[in-house]
Regions:
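Structural motif
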Residues: 45, 102-104, 158
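Small/aliphatic-rich secondary-structure junction motif
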Residues: 4-67, 91-100
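Short glycine-rich, flexible loops that bind phosphorylated cofactors or substrates
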Residues: 23, 109, 133-135
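Short, well-ordered secondary-structure micro-motifs
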Residues: 27, 54-57, 111-114, 137-139
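Structural beta-alpha unit
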Residues: 2-9, 86-125
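A short acidic, glycine-rich active-site loop
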Residues: 64-83
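Gly/Ser-rich helix-loop-strand patches that form or flank binding pockets
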Residues: 1-5, 115-159
Length: 159
């Protein structure tokens, strides 16, 4: 991407990831402000993980959910993701930019973030240092670590 003078822009297409946690909201706010300052395109992603099924590890036990349980699980995740994205929608409208808002269901967050950045042509990922699973501020979250290790796009980590 190039600016009005024909000079290349460093970041023109930014992917923001959020799980709705307080630290993720902070990351989204930083990403939105950066996108506004750079006049960059914004895509926001929230990912909900698949239902874990216990096949019993080769033993007689295990648990396989019914269709109704799967439907309830999917509906709850869809509702949760909708709330997260509604909050982000309000943030981007308040600052005066537009954003594409995506929910990726039944996926693993790091893989979905990396794939979305690639498929959308993003040149920067902004994400929190840790999300809901973060135990301590001193530790980098597992999803963030995986995006840093496996991704090919620069990552801005907000703590």
């Amino acid at each position: 991407m190039f600016d009005e003078q024909g000079s290349p822009r460093m970041y023109a297409n930014i992917l923001l990831s959020t799980d709705g946690s307080d630290v993720a909201k902070k990351g989204v706010k930083h990403g939105i402000a950066l996108a506004k300052a750079l006049n960059a395109k914004v895509t926001v992603i929230t990912v909900t993980e698949p239902l874990e099924i216990d096949y019993g590890g080769g033993h007689a036990g295990g648990w396989v959910p019914s269709k109704e349980e799967i439907d309830r699980f999917d509906a709850a995740h869809k509702e949760s993701a909708s709330k997260v994205l509604d909050e982000v929608r309000a943030m981007v409208e308040q600052i005066g930019i537009s954003a594409e808002l995506l929910h990726v269901p039944n996926a693993y967050p790091a893989a979905a973030i990396i794939e979305t950045a690639k498929s959308k042509g993003c040149d920067l990922i902004v994400m929190a240092s840790h999300g809901r699973r973060g135990l301590k501020k001193l530790l980098l979250g597992s999803q963030t670590s995986q995006v840093l290790a496996d991704g090919s796009v620069p990552v801005l980590v907000v703590c």
